[in-house]
């Protein structure tokens, strides 16, 4: 499967520092989750909570539009995080998407949901993948949009000091079907191979002329 990134900004939500994702949009109508039984009512309350969070994130978009004084306001993505320590969880946007998919499934009957559960049907992905946060010190260099190799800076200066750049990378697992071909493909008739694919994200880098700036670089994002 392929993970998508969306713009991310660091903002303050209700007086607390947090990471907001104004690019997030929901699909479908969460109000359709309401139903006659108690189980559905419980899911409706979860849907209302999720919808409220999304509305807050969308409201913040009006506050954090980039201005002339803040040229770097729109330079973050969900796969790049500036932090003083290693993030303990995957990017928030991915968690929100998984939760939204759960709510969408909640609109089906219990029987349909039971049969649609991948764990119950024995569903497996075509290619196995692993995801983890890596530092600029581990990446060292990357390729930008022009094809040039640039140095990925480990630390980013901020008003109160420095923060490290972390990248959430997804790549094909070295175990399982990575070398034997894609799962579910008939090897008698087809040749297949699981390959790690890359996408561009914005990061603070330095080119071979020692010029420092925000550039789009390639990182591993799916298998």
Curated annotation (Swiss-Prot):
Cellular location(s): Secreted
InterPro entries: Brain-der_neurotrophic_factor, Cystine-knot_cytokine, Nerve_growth_factor-like, Nerve_growth_factor-rel, Nerve_growth_factor_CS
Keywords from the UniProt entry: Cleavage on pair of basic residues, Disulfide bond, Glycoprotein, Growth factor, Secreted, Signal
Cellular component GO terms held in the UniProt record: axon; dendrite; extracellular space; synaptic vesicle
SUPFAM superfamilies, sorted: Cystine-knot cytokines
Transmembrane segments: none
SMART domains registered for this protein in UniProt: NGF
Glycoprotein listed as a keyword: yes
Glycosylation sites: 107
Keyword Signal attached: yes
Record GO terms (molecular function): growth factor activity; nerve growth factor receptor binding
Cysteines paired by S-S bonds: 127-194, 172-223
Propeptide: 6-114
Range of residues in the leader sequence: 1-5
GO BP field: cell surface receptor protein tyrosine kinase signaling pathway; modulation of chemical synaptic transmission; negative regulation of neuron apoptotic process; nerve development; nerve growth factor signaling pathway; neuron projection morphogenesis
Free-text function comment from the UniProt entry: Promotes the survival of neuronal populations that are all located either in the central nervous system or directly connected to it.
Family: Belongs to the NGF-beta family.
PANTHER family, A to Z: BRAIN-DERIVED NEUROTROPHIC FACTOR, NERVE GROWTH FACTOR NGF -RELATED
Protein name (record): Neurotrophic factor BDNF precursor form
Gene field: BDNF
């Amino acid at each position: 499967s392929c993970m998508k990134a969306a713009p991310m900004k660091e903002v303050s939500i209700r007086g607390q520092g947090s990471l907001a994702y104004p690019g997030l949009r929901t699909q479908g109508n969460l109000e359709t989750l309401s139903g006659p039984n108690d189980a559905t009512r419980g899911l409706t309350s979860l849907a209302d909570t999720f919808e409220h969070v999304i509305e807050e994130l969308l409201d913040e978009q009006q506050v954090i539009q980039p201005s002339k004084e803040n040229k770097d306001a729109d330079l973050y993505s969900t796969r790049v995080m500036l932090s003083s320590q290693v993030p303990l969880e995957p990017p928030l946007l991915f968690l929100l998407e998984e939760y939204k998919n759960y709510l969408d499934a909640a609109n089906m009957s219990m029987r349909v949901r039971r049969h649609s559960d991948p764990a119950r049907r024995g569903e497996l992905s075509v290619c196995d993948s692993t995801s983890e946060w890596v530092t600029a010190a581990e990446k060292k260099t990357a390729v930008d949009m022009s094809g040039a190799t640039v140095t990925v800076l480990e630390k980013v200066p901020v008003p109160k000091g420095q923060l490290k750049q972390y990248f959430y990378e997804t790549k094909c697992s070295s175990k399982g079907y990575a070398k034997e071909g894609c799962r579910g493909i008939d090897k008698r008739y087809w040749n297949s191979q699981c390959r790690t694919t890359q996408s561009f994200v914005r990061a603070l880098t330095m080119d071979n002329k020692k010029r420092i700036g925000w550039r789009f670089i390639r990182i591993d994002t799916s298998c």
